[in-house]
Amino acid sequence: MTKWKRANPNGTRDYLFEECTLIEEVEQKLRRTFLERGYEEIRTPTIEFYDVFAFQSRPIDEEKMYKFFDEKGRIIVLRPDMTIPLARVVGTQRCDTPLKVTYSGNVFRANESLAGKYNEIVQSGIEVIGIDNVRAEIECVISVIQSLQKLKVQSFTIEIGQVQLYKCIVKKLSIHEEEEKVLRTYIESKNYASLSNFIRDKKLDRCDETVKLLEKLPRLFGNLEVIEEAEKLASSNEMKMAITRVKEIYEAIEKLGYGSYISIDLGMIQHLDYYTGVIFKGYIYEIGEEIVSGGRYDELIGNFGEMLPAVGLAVQVNQIVKALQEQQEPYERKRIDIMIHYELNRLAEAERLRNLLQKDGKKVALSLFSNLNDTFQFARKNQIVTVVEAKSESLVEYVWKEKWVVQKEGETSCVTFKLR
């Protein structure tokens, strides 16, 4: 029964000290940036009913959810996604729209063993709800670019795709659901040979404009030249409108001076089926995994109430932290500047002194040792060069100068002691 008591479950890990501080700093900087841009905060439970994620389109595989039972035997899950619970809140609470919300929290998904992915990750994100024009997508992309800039993330790019274009192609060519799943993997992985074989095996007419567009889809990534190429092959108004939307978003963001942070990839297809239009993925060149993901989901909120258009972007905090650790100087934990050793009857005075010194920007801690020599040893081990002793009758300051020497003594009040 104690076999696993010293181990972590697959896909999880412990975060210690400096890394914890960095995670917290990233979350708080993202939060501040989003709040400054007018987003309002929403928090949802870590656990949700299974039914929240089990509507008809099944956007998240059941096998990827951590499931258990509540006291009444109902199926509960650790949330595998942040957007769906937010859709539940907006749909059931009848929030006034348009609405801009931000969130941060842990997401849990059971990935395959040895896949190199964590099953528990931290996400911070934004959603713009109730707006169906391109201003919603533009707002989301600008917000995320500015937040990554403030975090000093280097060499990142956000790719803009269009799942509606892919869905139009699939519909026009009458590709069945099971075949579509296979086709999707070929396009996403840019497997040109397998895609060509798929077209041949399906006996699709390679002279047909839609088939030409399908075959070119994995190659349609880059800048506005990609849009021009896709427009030539678009065979329906719906396809043309989908392509034009990507063009409008790209041009608007480029005019703001953020062109170096964006690119187009019309062969990008999100794995979550609730996306209905423009989609996004962000990467840092040095890191393979995505740091940003999201898109438009105009039909999701309707599963919980009124049908409302919406766009969202999620930032993968763990990946941002990993990038910052690689791109920047090693994070140095702020050491304790002063340690206060006190006799129990001088606790109040010691705490007052700690508060006074802290207001000057010092990191000050009360010693946990009853013996002064133990406090000295701890201070040396942790590179603390100043120890203040709160004795029964006075305060004494010691400084390390190859040995502990008295710097000042004699004061009984922490206020006058600090001023000396």
From Swiss-Prot:
<comment type="similarity">
    <text>Belongs to the class-II aminoacyl-tRNA synthetase family. HisZ subfamily.</text>
</comment>
<dbReference type="GO" id="GO:0140096">
    <property type="term" value="F:catalytic activity, acting on a protein"/>
</dbReference>
<keyword id="KW-0028">Amino-acid biosynthesis</keyword>
<dbReference type="GO" id="GO:0006427">
    <property type="term" value="P:histidyl-tRNA aminoacylation"/>
</dbReference>
<dbReference type="InterPro" id="IPR004517">
    <property type="entry name" value="HisZ"/>
</dbReference>
<dbReference type="GO" id="GO:0000105">
    <property type="term" value="P:L-histidine biosynthetic process"/>
</dbReference>
<dbReference type="Pfam" id="PF13393">
    <property type="entry name" value="tRNA-synt_His"/>
</dbReference>
<dbReference type="InterPro" id="IPR041715">
    <property type="entry name" value="HisRS-like_core"/>
</dbReference>
<dbReference type="InterPro" id="IPR045864">
    <property type="entry name" value="aa-tRNA-synth_II/BPL/LPL"/>
</dbReference>
<comment type="subunit">
    <text>Heteromultimer composed of HisG and HisZ subunits.</text>
</comment>
<dbReference type="GO" id="GO:0004821">
    <property type="term" value="F:histidine-tRNA ligase activity"/>
</dbReference>
<dbReference type="GO" id="GO:0005737">
    <property type="term" value="C:cytoplasm"/>
</dbReference>
<keyword id="KW-0963">Cytoplasm</keyword>
<comment type="pathway">
    <text>Amino-acid biosynthesis; L-histidine biosynthesis; L-histidine from 5-phospho-alpha-D-ribose 1-diphosphate: step 1/9.</text>
</comment>
<dbReference type="GO" id="GO:0016740">
    <property type="term" value="F:transferase activity"/>
</dbReference>
<dbReference type="InterPro" id="IPR004516">
    <property type="entry name" value="HisRS/HisZ"/>
</dbReference>
<keyword id="KW-0368">Histidine biosynthesis</keyword>
<dbReference type="InterPro" id="IPR006195">
    <property type="entry name" value="aa-tRNA-synth_II"/>
</dbReference>
<protein>
    <recommendedName>
        <fullName>ATP phosphoribosyltransferase regulatory subunit</fullName>
    </recommendedName>
</protein>
<comment type="function">
    <text>Required for the first step of histidine biosynthesis. May allow the feedback regulation of ATP phosphoribosyltransferase activity by histidine.</text>
</comment>
